[in-house]
């Protein structure tokens, strides 16, 4: 065949990683192939995809100098000004195939921009053949599959790419602009890039690109680019494109790839060590009314020895708190008192003055701290007072001693106990932070309600440690709600322990690790980090998933009812949903960070002529993509500047609530069998997190050690004051601060060094930012606190307290 005579090669096309120009929907791509402006062929339209594979053949009449131009368009926007342009390539036929010798060539080319400089992305794969034999469609399919994990981008507005029309594939992800500045510049295209963990370097030569991806074509889920995974391990990706590994031997998941010299014994030992750390942390969690005076603010020794009250009429508000500390009784009993002994030989004391009895020796003086804020803002003890001088207890109250001789009080009217002496002014007065007054009082009220009282009898639950999920499901689901309200008695198969609280704590610890494990596809990790959880919208892969969600709801209710804690933490929106509160755009940050940025941009900018949106969203479930109307006929209703707020609200509700509504309703049906909805609604979402998970003992030294500073030095006065304030706070206030800055009160098992952000490990950071007249601001996705340069310790403490105590909800960005 002469080079000057036209030849008739065949053409097949596929593309991968097209640019998603619309924020909320996928394009309907088709290709137009043109030779010399005369021969034009158009492919069919592939609906809603960034990786179309047409597998259509066209006959072309070309010579060596012919230019083949292939353009990709979005059929949805073909009538718009830019015709939905998605990229173009131009190929000189003589450069890629020898028309005289014939042959079959597979080419991979990067899509290029047009003269309009619209951002494009992705690759076009072409099969050119000069014979009539059928091309190797398997090869084309393999190449198509090999690009599935290529970098993808999403954007809001057509922009000029800063350097090239596509990002280079590399081993590390490009830096997200929001990572350093959460206040996203509206002129910048919000994007996220999730390359595979070991992507091959991009090559200018199409053949090189083709080969590099072809080498990964046959990788199964049991291997990756580093080789075969150990026996029983599988590689998976979550909904955010993050790779994690499943160990089917132990039914656990991890973000860390198992090493090639995998040692099962060493791995098991490490898991057991981590489990012990988590167990100790879990068992140390508590709530305000469970903690002793040791967790109260410490007073100077000199002030504790003060015995003389101040002059009357002091302007300082004085509050009182019983420490429960006692001293040994010596000498004679006070007038009117008598000591007697029960038949069991236990001494008790009769006060004939008030005709009351008590276990407490009136000679054993109970110290009453009376402290208030003086002129310089420090706490000062006013006096100590013996219990015997306080008079009788109110009707229905009883004083008792713990086995460590610490006094506590029983209110038989409400069947509750407290450390606070009812004869003293409430320790929860104006000197205590508002949130603490509210939470503790809510807790006392909540637990005093008849629906939360343990019924007579026992509820026996027998489980095997190595099969705790299935055994617990069978045991808890076979019993009625009223049976579950009886005293809980846990027994582990093959163990002789009696449950006086320790076994039930161990039970809830182990069970929460199992039932929230992403291995079972019921829950998945959030966009915030890899330890807060959200409901998996694809949990329907298990046909019994709704029964399991009802079971999990029962377990959460059971833990609250029996005053136990679960070692699990959810996104803020989940707690809001439990309280039947309306979710907001801020809650989206923990579910889908990119969508949160895009919706925020939509609200803050003019979208007329920029975004072609309707009141509908595209959703993919088990490979099937469908359009969902956000309101009746939504796919035909355009989004404008006037109705975009409603659109954002509906998208937020669909993404957070509607997608998992079926699962969540099953969860709540089980939960409300033990905890009535009207009772749990007394809490807010942050208090509900503490009610379910308890309050952790936070190691401030570890926190400080793994903190970064921007604009500050560790030696700066404001930083020194910050850590002094944190150390002076009790465990509950520290947990509140942790919630405020990271979105959860959970601490990773290995401490703050393993703190996670939305894009992987992210250390706690204090940044110099803001006006000293303003409050500190947190960025929960990045574990960052914007701290203005306050001039004094008092100002910093005041501003921090207001920010932490009065701010509601997660995602303060």
UniProtKB/Swiss-Prot annotation:
Residues 148-167, 251-264, 293-307 have a biased composition (Polar residues). Its EC number is 2.3.2.26. Residues 480-813 form the HECT domain. It is an enzyme of class 2 (transferase). Residues 1-109 form the C2 domain. InterPro entries: C2_dom, C2_domain_sf, E3_ub_ligase_SMURF1, E3_ubiq-protein_ligase, HECT_dom, Hect_E3_ubiquitin_ligase, WW_dom, WW_dom_sf. Residues 265-292 have a biased composition (Basic and acidic residues). Pathway: Protein modification; protein ubiquitination. GO terms for biological process: protein transport to vacuole involved in ubiquitin-dependent protein catabolic process via the multivesicular body sorting pathway; protein ubiquitination; ubiquitin-dependent protein catabolic process. Residues 227-260, 331-364, 391-424 form the WW domain. It catalyses: S-ubiquitinyl-[E2 ubiquitin-conjugating enzyme]-L-cysteine + [acceptor protein]-L-lysine = [E2 ubiquitin-conjugating enzyme]-L-cysteine + N(6)-ubiquitinyl-[acceptor protein]-L-lysine. Pfam families: C2 (PF00168), HECT (PF00632), WW (PF00397). Residues 131-235, 251-351 are annotated as: Disordered. The keyword Metal-binding does not apply. The active site is at 781 (glycyl thioester intermediate). Interacts with creD. E3 ubiquitin-protein ligase which accepts ubiquitin from an E2 ubiquitin-conjugating enzyme in the form of a thioester and then directly transfers the ubiquitin to targeted substrates. Probably involved in the regulatory network controlling carbon source utilization. This is Probable E3 ubiquitin-protein ligase hulA. It comes from Aspergillus fumigatus (strain ATCC MYA-4609 / CBS 101355 / FGSC A1100 / Af293).
């Amino acid at each position: 065949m002469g080079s000057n005579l036209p030849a008739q090669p065949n053409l097949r096309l596929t593309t991968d990683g097209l640019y998603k120009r619309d924020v909320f929907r996928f394009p309907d791509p088709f290709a137009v192939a043109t030779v010399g402006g005369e021969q034009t062929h158009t492919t069919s339209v592939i609906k809603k995809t960034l990786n179309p594979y047409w597998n259509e053949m066209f006959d072309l009449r070309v010579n060596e100098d012919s230019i083949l131009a292939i353009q990709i368009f979005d059929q949805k926007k073909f009538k718009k000004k830019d015709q939905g342009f998605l990229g173009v390539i131009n190929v000189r036929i003589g450069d890629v195939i020898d028309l005289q010798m014939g042959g079959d060539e597979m080419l991979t080319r990067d899509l290029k921009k047009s003269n309009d400089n619209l951002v494009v992305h992705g690759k076009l794969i072409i099969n050119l053949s000069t014979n009539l034999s059928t091309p190797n469609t398997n090869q084309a399919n393999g190449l198509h599959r090999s690009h599935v994990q290529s970098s993808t981008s999403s954007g809001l507005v057509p922009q000029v790419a800063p350097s090239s029309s596509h990002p280079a594939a590399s081993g590390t992800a490009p830096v997200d602009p929001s990572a350093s500045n959460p206040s996203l510049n509206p002129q910048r295209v919000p994007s996220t890039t999730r390359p595979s963990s070991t992507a091959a370097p991009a090559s200018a030569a199409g053949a090189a690109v083709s080969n590099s991806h072809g080498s990964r074509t046959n990788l199964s889920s049991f291997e990756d680019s580093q080789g075969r995974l150990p026996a029983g391990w599988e590689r998976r990706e979550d909904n955010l494109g993050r790779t994690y590994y499943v160990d089917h031997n132990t039914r656990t998941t991890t973000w860390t790839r198992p090493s090639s010299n995998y040692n099962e014994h060493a791995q098991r030992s490490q898991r057991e060590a981590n489990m012990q750390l988590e167990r100790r942390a879990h068992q140390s969690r508590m709530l305000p009314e469970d903690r002793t005076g040791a967790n109260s603010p410490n007073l100077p020794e000199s002030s504790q020895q003060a015995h003389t009250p101040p002059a009357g009429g002091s302007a300082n508000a004085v509050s009182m708190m019983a420490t429960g500390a006692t001293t040994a009784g010596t000498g004679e009993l006070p007038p009117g008192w008598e000591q007697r002994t029960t038949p069991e030989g236990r001494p008790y004391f009769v006060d004939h003055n008030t005709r009351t009895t008590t276990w407490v020796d009136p000679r054993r003086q109970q110290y009453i701290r009376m402290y208030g804020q003086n002129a310089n803002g420090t706490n000062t003890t006013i006096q100590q007072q013996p219990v015997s001088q306080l008079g009788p207890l109110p009707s229905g109250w009883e004083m008792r001693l713990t086995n460590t001789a610490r006094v506590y009080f029983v209110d038989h009217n409400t069947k509750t106990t407290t450390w606070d002496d009812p004869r003293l002014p409430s320790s929860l007065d104006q000197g205590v932070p508002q949130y603490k007054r509210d939470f503790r009082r809510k807790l006392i009220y909540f637990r005093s309600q008849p629906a939360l009282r343990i019924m007579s009898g026992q509820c026996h639950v027998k489980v095997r440690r190595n099969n705790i999920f299935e055994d617990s499901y069978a045991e808890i689901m076979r019993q009625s709600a009223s049976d579950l309200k009886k005293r809980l008695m846990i027994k582990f198969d093959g163990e002789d322990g009696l449950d006086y609280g320790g076994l039930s704590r161990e039970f809830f610890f182990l069970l929460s690790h199992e039932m929230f494990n992403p291995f079972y596809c019921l829950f998945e990790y959030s966009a915030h980090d890899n330890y807060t959880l959200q409901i998996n919208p694809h949990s329907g892969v298990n046909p019994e998933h709704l029964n399991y969600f009802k079971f999990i709801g029962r377990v959460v209710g059971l833990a609250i009812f029996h005053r136990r804690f679960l070692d699990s933490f959810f996104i803020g929106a989940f707690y809001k949903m439990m309280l039947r509160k309306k979710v907001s755009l801020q809650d989206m940050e923990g579910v889908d960070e990119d969508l949160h940025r895009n919706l925020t941009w939509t609200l803050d900018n003019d979208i007329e002529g920029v975004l072609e949106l309707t009141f509908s969203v595209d959703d993919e479930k088990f490979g099937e993509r469908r359009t969902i109307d956000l309101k009746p006929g939504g796919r035909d209703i355009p989004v404008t500047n006037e109705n975009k707020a409603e659109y954002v609200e509906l998208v937020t509700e669909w993404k957070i609530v509607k997608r998992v509504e079926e699962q969540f309703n099953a969860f709540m049906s089980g939960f409300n069998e033990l905890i009535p909805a009207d009772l749990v609604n007394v809490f807010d979402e942050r208090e509900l997190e503490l009610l379910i998970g308890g309050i952790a003992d936070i190691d401030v030294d570890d926190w400080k050690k793994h903190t970064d500073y921007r604009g500050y030095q560790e030696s700066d006065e404001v930083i020194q004051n910050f850590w002094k304030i944190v150390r002076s706070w009790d465990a509950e206030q520290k947990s509140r601060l942790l919630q405020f800055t990271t979105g959860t009160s959970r601490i990773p098992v290995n401490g703050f060094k393993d703190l996670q952000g939305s894009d992987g490990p992210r250390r706690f950071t204090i940044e110099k930012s803001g006006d000293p007249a303003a409050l500190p601001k947190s960025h929960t996705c990045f574990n960052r606190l914007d701290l203005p340069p306050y001039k004094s310790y008092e100002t910093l403490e005041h501003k921090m307290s207001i920010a932490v105590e009065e701010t509601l909800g997660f995602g303060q960005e």
